[in-house]
């Protein structure tokens, strides 16, 4: 009887929680993406004005519920001196969203180096990665094929994991919902990193 009640309680009052890192260089649009995610998935969330978002120093945390899953986002600062902190969070995470500023061709190689260092970490083996080519609302941005070509020599280092490169505009919200829903499917089916249980009451 206890097992039945325990199972019923879990079904009704607990969600599977997955930690997802939002990484990328500074000014790529990580925090704007996080704010748009919270606005789109949390009914009563009144987001901060996107014009007031500044460079993240440290960590922003946000939560989004999608069906029976709860995503706990950790938006980490992307400045060079803060990138050394990224790997402290790898062991706990279930997925990575890597944001690229597709309007900043000058820093594309720097972004690629940061991506390559991240994706080759053993602590992230098997963890799904969503690569967002952000700022696609800007006419002069690099296209998805341009981004894929620039990152092509990273392909062999991605290994056996779910990985998707997707167009996005965090400012307008285009591609935000699709990216989150893709990530939810991936983390839920990844048996190598089981979720944490959290009460939702």
UniProtKB/Swiss-Prot annotation:
InterPro entries for the chain: P-loop_NTPase, Small_GTP-bd, Small_GTPase_ARF, Small_GTPase_ARF/SAR
Entries under CDD domains matching the protein: Arfrp1
PROSITE patterns, alphabetized: ARF
GO cellular-component term (any): Golgi apparatus
GO biological-process terms attached to the record: Golgi to plasma membrane protein transport; intracellular protein transport; protein localization to Golgi apparatus
Keyword Nucleotide-binding: yes
Keywords: Acetylation, Golgi apparatus, GTP-binding, Nucleotide-binding
Compartments (UniProt record): Golgi apparatus; Golgi apparatus, trans-Golgi network
GO molecular function, one term: GTP binding
Keyword GTP-binding appears in the UniProt entry: yes
A Pfam family of this chain: Arf
Modified residues (N-acetylmethionine): 1
Protein family membership: Belongs to the small GTPase superfamily. Arf family.
Protein function: Trans-Golgi-associated GTPase that regulates protein sorting. Controls the targeting of ARL1 and its effector to the trans-Golgi. Required for the lipidation of chylomicrons in the intestine and required for VLDL lipidation in the liver.
Subunit structure, as described in the record: Interacts with SYS1.
Protein name: ADP-ribosylation factor-related protein 1
Species name: Bos taurus
């Amino acid at each position: 009887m206890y097992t039945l009640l325990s199972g019923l309680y879990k079904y009704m009052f607990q969600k599977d929680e997955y930690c997802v890192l939002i990484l990328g260089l500074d000014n790529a649009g990580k925090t704007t993406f996080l704010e748009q995610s919270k606005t789109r998935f949390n009914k009563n969330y009144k987001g901060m004005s996107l014009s007031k978002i500044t460079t993240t120093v440290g960590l922003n945390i946000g939560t989004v519920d999608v069906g029976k899953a709860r995503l706990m986002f950790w938006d980490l600062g992307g400045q060079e001196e803060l990138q050394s902190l990224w790997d402290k969070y790898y062991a706990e995470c279930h997925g990575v969203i890597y944001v690229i500023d597709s309007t900043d061709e000058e820093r594309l190689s720097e972004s690629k180096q940061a991506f390559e260092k991240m994706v080759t970490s053993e602590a992230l083996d098997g963890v799904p990665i969503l690569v967002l080519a952000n700022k696609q609302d800007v006419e002069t941005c690099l296209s998805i094929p341009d981004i894929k070509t620039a990152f092509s020599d990273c392909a062999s280092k991605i290994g056996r994991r779910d990985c998707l490169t997707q167009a996005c505009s965090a400012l307008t919200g285009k591609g935000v919902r699709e990216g989150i829903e893709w990530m939810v499917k991936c983390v839920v089916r990844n048996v190598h990193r089981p979720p944490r249980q959290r009460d939702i009451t």
